[in-house]
Regions:
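Fe-S-dependent hydro-lyases/dehydratases of central metabolism
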Residues: 1-327
């Protein structure tokens, strides 16, 4: 059970930890007293089946959940439980994306059922643990458990590349992460800024996505589209080191990407990547698109693959492995 003073503490649920973000006063009491009173939240379960298609990531899955469930308060104040056979196809980083954005779903937390991947991930990082110790500590649902929010099946094969659009506050449509839309149905949306990174999309796997798209574009003789500023922010020093070791940093720089050191950035309206005027359009891998939060412009949330592909085409574009080779 982990509590910390960050709204996205819940991304720790990827490793089967129960994780809450709390306020500074509550956290101070926790540190002083070494215990906390917690009301057990209601739960909602998402049963994942199948595997994602090329061009889709866990970000598209959570955008789908925001659109189809959180929009109607199905996830409000509940623990979002992710399980089912399809979960095995998602890496630990991808599971972290799901749990991270439980916050945007207005949920209490997000947690993934543990499996062999969980064990392997922990053993790689904790020399003091054994497989038996980890298994004994697994947090699993009771058999025949009742879910106040219900059990909802999500077929990963049916997930399509998505965005959360900025809405139109002047017409009564608020800017909100629950404004889901399929990319192939929004028409041509030209962009000024492509922003990749943040706690949601600055992990090892996310950077492998950015590098894959960038390499494909460079191999096709392309660079970041004219009139587009592309930023990639490292999620941590460890991720930055990995990028340098794998040669990804060189790829990004060759393509014209502007790199940013780890830290909270455009998500909170700080640093490079923030829009300057209401006419600017940003496609971003961050987790929130509330009006004014990342500058006065319009902000579309999307997956790491979509953000990077869009940086090279100059408009919001879903990634496909052959998109650049086909001209």
């Amino acid at each position: 059970f982990i509590q910390a003073t960050d709204s996205h503490t819940c991304m720790g649920g990827a490793s089967n930890a129960l994780t809450y973000g709390v306020g500074s006063t509550e956290y101070a009491n926790l540190v002083h007293n070494q215990f906390a009173f917690v009301k057990v939240p209601e739960s909602i379960r998402f049963e994942l089946e199948g595997e994602l298609n090329p061009g889709c990531t866990a970000k598209d899955v959570i955008l789908h959940i925001l659109w189809r469930y959180a929009k109607y308060s199905d996830t409000l104040d509940r623990s979002m439980e992710f399980g089912g056979p399809g979960l095995a196809s998602l890496s630990m980083d991808e599971r972290a994306t799901l749990c991270n954005m439980a916050t945007e779903c207005s949920a209490k937390t997000g947690i993934c059922e543990p499996d062999q991947l969980t064990i392997n991930w922990l053993l790689e990082r904790r020399s003091d643990l054994s497989e038996k110790v980890i298994r004994d500590a697994f947090v699993l649902p009771d058999k025949d458990a009742h879910y106040d929010g219900g059990i909802h099946t999500i077929n990963l094969n049916e997930i399509r590349p998505m965005v959360a659009h900025p809405g139109d506050p002047d017409e009564g449509v608020p800017s909100d992460p629950t404004n889901g839309a399929y990319i192939d149905e929004i028409g041509d949306v030209k962009i000024n800024i492509a922003y990749a990174g943040s706690c949601t999309a600055g992990k090892d796997d996310d950077f492998s996505y950015y590098a894959m798209v960038t390499k494909a574009a460079l191999d096709a003789g392309m660079k970041i589209a004219e009139g587009v500023e592309c930023y990639i922010q490292f999620g941590s020093k460890t991720v930055k080191d990995l990028s340098e070791r794998n040669g990804w940093t060189d790829l990004f720089e060759a393509a014209g990407v502007k790199l940013i050191d780890p830290g909270c950035g455009a998500c909170i309206g700080a640093g490079p990547g923030v829009s300057n005027n209401p006419d600017q359009v940003t496609v971003s891998a961050i987790n929130r698109n509330f009006q004014g939060r990342s500058g006065p412009g319009k902000l579309y949330l999307a997956s790491p693959l979509t953000v990077m592909a869009s940086a090279f085409t100059g408009k919001i574009t879903a990634w496909h492995p052959d998109m650049f080779s086909n001209g």
